[in-house]
Amino acid sequence: MVGPENSEKPTILIRGWLWFRDIPSKPLAKLRGVARQAIELAKDDPRRLIHSLKVGLTVTLVSLLYYLQPLYNNLGASAMWAVMTVVVVFEFSVGGTIGKCLNRGLATLAAAALALGANHLAILSGGENEPYVIGLFVFIQAVAMSFVRFFPKVKARYDYGMLIFILTFSLVSISGLRINEVIKLAQARFVTIVIGASTCLAVCILIYPVWAGEDLHKYVGKNISQLGNFLEEHMDQCFKRSSDARIEITKPSISNLNSILVDSKGREETLANLAGWEPGHGQFMFRHPWKQYLKIGNLTRQCACRLEPINDYLNSNIQAPQEIQCKIQEAFSESGKTLKELAWAIETMTKPSSANPHIENLKTASENLKILLRSGIKGDESDILQIIPIAVVMTDMVSSVEQIGDAVNELSLMAKFKSKTGNGVEGESEIGHDKNCIEIGMAEIPSLSVAIDERTEFSADEQILI
Amino acid sequence: MVGPENSEKPTILIRGWLWFRDIPSKPLAKLRGVARQAIELAKDDPRRLIHSLKVGLTVTLVSLLYYLQPLYNNLGASAMWAVMTVVVVFEFSVGGTIGKCLNRGLATLAAAALALGANHLAILSGGENEPYVIGLFVFIQAVAMSFVRFFPKVKARYDYGMLIFILTFSLVSISGLRINEVIKLAQARFVTIVIGASTCLAVCILIYPVWAGEDLHKYVGKNISQLGNFLEEHMDQCFKRSSDARIEITKPSISNLNSILVDSKGREETLANLAGWEPGHGQFMFRHPWKQYLKIGNLTRQCACRLEPINDYLNSNIQAPQEIQCKIQEAFSESGKTLKELAWAIETMTKPSSANPHIENLKTASENLKILLRSGIKGDESDILQIIPIAVVMTDMVSSVEQIGDAVNELSLMAKFKSKTGNGVEGESEIGHDKNCIEIGMAEIPSLSVAIDERTEFSADEQILI
């Protein structure tokens, strides 16, 4: 029993020493981690750094009220309200800042006026009852305004205003009990608040402004284009892999799909709310149809949702007849192209006319696949059973893509997108690709040619793609 | 030309009169609409009304500082900070209120201490440079803290604290330039803030407290149970309709599915963040595994997402072989039962052991369906093609339900759910129903009995359900 004890002691000592030695390095490692995260945040969106500098600048500017004797003599201790306003009101986007300024300004004015009225009423009611009457007023308005904050519309846009209303009403009405010069004080405060708010607005709008509307516009476009990329590249890889070699599938695009599904809803709604406060800027008018972006966003999410089950099938080695694979691949790649055209139309604010032929192709491809499956079902059954889930996802997706197309068309009418000058180069190479694909299919299975014969009523433009 | 003009004039007059007459009724109608909405909000969750009354009570209580002479003499104009604290800090849930109180309190203390230190440094640097040094400090801290607010973790839990830090640091350090009794002033403010915050906390916790953790717990359970109901009832209706008469499908459950998909994510994350601030209460310990609820919520959303395409098939009249319909119906109803058992386990905080047999049944049903489809595919092809999309959705869903089961099991281990005292009555009637269903199938198609023979290795419990 002596041996183990002896050898244990030094181990404990060594462990203790190691633990002790690591103490300074642990917080250092953490600090390094934080620094790395900070650099990533700044690289990811440099506007964050600019925003921080803008806040610093504005706070320092407003502090001048304290440093400069003549200004301070006029405003006194109320000057602190200017600093307060800046810190509380300065938001990342112009819309956020304007919204908070308006909320704060209007709520302060309205609440102060009402509170002075309430004070007057209380004085009229007689000296003794004054505190009770004012207490009653304060109670009633606090209850009412707290309840109004639960209204969904108020919560989305005027929550801050309601808070300031309760605050100002309470402060002004109870101050009236003690300070007789309440109006003079309120004046000084109001002036400082206006100074703070206007400095804020000036810095926010004039120096590298961040427009929530522009962010929303880009974000919705980016999501559609990500979905399009996913469809084009990812599905391509998926089919290549089953026919060619085992190519490593790039996982990032799947996680992109997930981020569209999960995070976009809240972000889009916030941005649309903020964008509503913004004046016209750049290509956007004052009443740009921001709500329509939410509709497009919802449809994009729906489409991503319908694509989600596809992940499960990607890992299985698909062994379906070549011509069915071809049709499915065609539909996916057409969807991808449609979505990318739509995203491009949103981005450049041009009419999405170039997406229309893709949508037509898509409908044709989807119909063709259905016909093919019905006629081809006499083939190897287990293979067809394997491919059917993907075909189902595809059919769902096609209707989703069509809906997105309609919604973008509506947007282009509402926001008066400009017409595009034609470019037809991109399309040609794709047609060649699809034709190849069909020729392989035609050679292999006769039922396909029957399916094609059934569709002779289609226009020449569509027939190329059948 | 005289005739129409004559008849037009009175029309304009009448229209004008009608428009004029409607003026008072329009705002009245709007007011009535708002009142109706308010009543609905209060009925929907009476805690909203109680919260509003609590806010009113607390604001009025704190206003007493102004009414009572001895209190006012001690605190002076700083008493307004108490009102301010109450209005800004009082949140709907206990977690929100505690979080804001801690954020406000700690940030104020830290910022005030640092600002006093900065002031001291500035004084040491010599009288002339003082404003510049302080201006530099204010600038640096405002930039740094504004940037720190972009860190996702900080944004989720400490955003308000960061705001208060910037505010307090700026106010205290620039006040130091003017007011020599800055420490005395800070003391009075701190006391009033503590008074405001403690009144807030007392009212919030002692009178009808709203626990964010409890809300999260119930909400996650409710979503799972809604999904279970949707599966059981809705799918039942769907198949009844195709075989029996055209029964009206109740749409509300589809919209429930949508609300799970769209709104739950943000709400769950907010509640989990708030729940993190709450002390132990009722059945929940201080460190209840709130994060696990987020995981369960994510899986529930995934399951709802996979079910979403089913809506498109509900409107088509399904005409598949009876025994396949039976299998699918069985799988959906088993999933429904599993989910409802899991929801019940969460709700009552008991171990979800009663869900396990359902999960086993579910796996069996899913396997059986696959076998059946493979063997039964020689039947009427167009019918099978019609049923396959639903079968695909079902397979996806089964794996989702299994994952939810695993996650709930994990939760029950982490949160030490109590074991359940057995109840076996519910299950029996279901077995009878399923048996019926199988007997119909058995009579019609021989391939099913082969499928069943293949599975003789299952336990007796499972065989009843095959």
Question: Which positions does each model-derived feature cover?
Answer:
Chain A
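Alpha-helical transmembrane segments and their membrane-interface boundaries
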Residues: 1-189, 205-215, 449-466
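Intracellular, membrane-proximal regulatory regions of polytopic membrane proteins
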Residues: 1-36, 42, 180-191, 202-387
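Aromatic- and histidine-enriched alpha-helix N-cap/loop-to-helix transition segments
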Residues: 56, 298, 302, 389-392, ...
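Membrane-helix cytosolic exit motif
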Residues: 207, 403-413
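Long amphipathic all-alpha helical oligomerization modules
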Residues: 350-398, 412-466
